[in-house]
Amino acid sequence: MTGFVLQVHIYQVSYVHVSTDLSVCLCGFLSVKRRNKNLLNNSEQEFVAGRRKTVLQALKKLKIQCSRQAVPNIALLGSGGAQRAMVGLLGSLVQREKAGLLDCILYLSGVSGSTWCMASLYKEPNWSTKLETVKEKIIERLSGPGVSLTDAMAKLKKYYYGKDFFSLTDVWAVLVVTSIVKEIDEHTLTEQRKQHNKDPFPIYAVIDKQSKQSNDGDPWFEINPYEAGYSLSGVFVDTGDFGSQFHKGSKIKHQDEFDMLYLQGKKILSQRNLSGGKSKLISTMNTADKRAEKQYIKRFAMDVCEDLSNAGISICKCMAQWIWGRKYNFLHNMTGENRPSTLLQSETRDYIDAGVLLNSPYFSVLREDRDIDLIISLDFSQGDPFMTVKDAAETCKKLKIPFPEVNITSEDKKKPKDFYVCCKLLYKHTPLFMFVCCLATICYNNNRF
C-alpha cells in the first residue's frame, strides 16, 4: 500500500511516497425501514457487488492474485479540515488513480471539508474514469469568480420558502460555502443513483446533535444516494424522504429532497474561526447550558453577518437565535423492538457537522454489515494528527466495536511518520487499519492550486 505525506499548496499538490508491498497490507420507500442486522440496503448490495468486480480487476493489474470471493473491502476516509481537506483529498485521489489504486477502493466516506471535494467529484458521472479532466474543472472553478450576491440571495429565499424548517445551515450553505466552493450546487443525491457504477460508493457523515448532547442513543448519522440513517442503530429512511414528516413510520407530509449545497452547509460549523475559533465553538456546543449555547450561536451568526454585504443582513439577524440542521424526525413515535427510545420522542432532530464529535467518518464504515477489511484514513486535521484516531479507538472500546489498538509513542508525537498500519487480529471482523498523516500548508500563488 502506498503511504505519503501531502504538501498541499493552492497552486500545486506534491507528494512524498513511501511504498510497501500492497499484498502485505491486504492480508424510494414510503415508510421507515429497519433491516435485520448484517443486511445492507438492496441497492447498496447491488452496487457493492458490481464494484467488487472492478476491485478484482484492479488487483489483477497490480499483479495481486485474488479470487472473487476473497476480494477485500477497502474504505477510504477523508477527515475534516476545510479547504485543506478539500484540496488534500482531491490530490490524494488523483495520485491513487495514477498509481492504479483508486479502483481498489470500495467506499469513499468523508466529513466536513472532505465532503466538499466529494460533492464536486460526484457531480460528474463516473468521475473516476476521467479524474484528470474533473480535477482541472474543479481547479478552474475554485480559481474563478464566486457566486454573485444576487444569486446567493435568490437561493436563500428559495430555501426559506421551500421547506418547513429554515435554519442557520441554510445561511451557511448559501453565504459561506458558496464563497469557498464557488458554485450553487442544486444536484441531489438520489439523482446520482445510476451515474456512478464505476466509482466508489459515497457516504457523507453527520451527527445527531441531541444524541451527542445527551450521551444516549446513536449520534452517528450517514447519508448516501439510497438512504439516510443511524449507522449503528440500523434505522434508515430513503434519502429522497429524509426531511419529510413521519408518524409511526409512515410519511404524512412530503418535503423536497435537500440539495448538495445544503449538505455541504452541514459541514462547516466546526471549521470557521469566528468568535473565538473552533475550540471555543466546540466547547460551547458541548455545554449543557442551553442558554449559554444560544447566546454563543447568536454572536456567532452576528459575526457572519458583519462579514457580509449589507444586503441580506436583516435576514441573517432574524436567524441569529435559530438552530442548525433541523429536520423532521423520521423515527417519531415509531413502535417495535430494537429502536432506541431516545430517537423516537422528539418531532424534530438537528443534524450537524460530524467534526464536532469526531473529525473522521469511522463509524460509517465500521458497520458490521459492510464487512470492511482495510480502512485507509487520510487525516487533514489541524493540530494533533493522532487525536482523531485515538478518539475513534477509545469510542470503539466503549461501544465494544472491534478496532485495532493504536499505540502512539512519544517519538511519534514529536516526529510523525508518513503512515501507520495497525492490525491486531483479536476479532474476526477487526479491519486492517492504515492511518496516513497528511501534513498540509496552504498558501496563495496567482490564484492557482
Identify the residue ranges that each predicted region occupies.
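Short acidic, glycine/serine/threonine-rich loops at helix termini
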Residues: 118-123, 215-217, 387-390
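Low-complexity, highly charged intrinsically disordered N-terminal segments
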Residues: 3-65
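Catalytic nucleophile loop
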Residues: 79-82, 104-121, 204
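Acidic, Ser/Thr-rich peripheral helices and adjacent loops at domain boundaries
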Residues: 125-143, 292, 314, 385-430
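Helix-rich "cap/lid" substructures immediately adjacent to catalytic or cofactor-binding pockets
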Residues: 52-105
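Patatin-like phospholipase A catalytic core
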Residues: 101, 124-125, 134-364, 371, ...
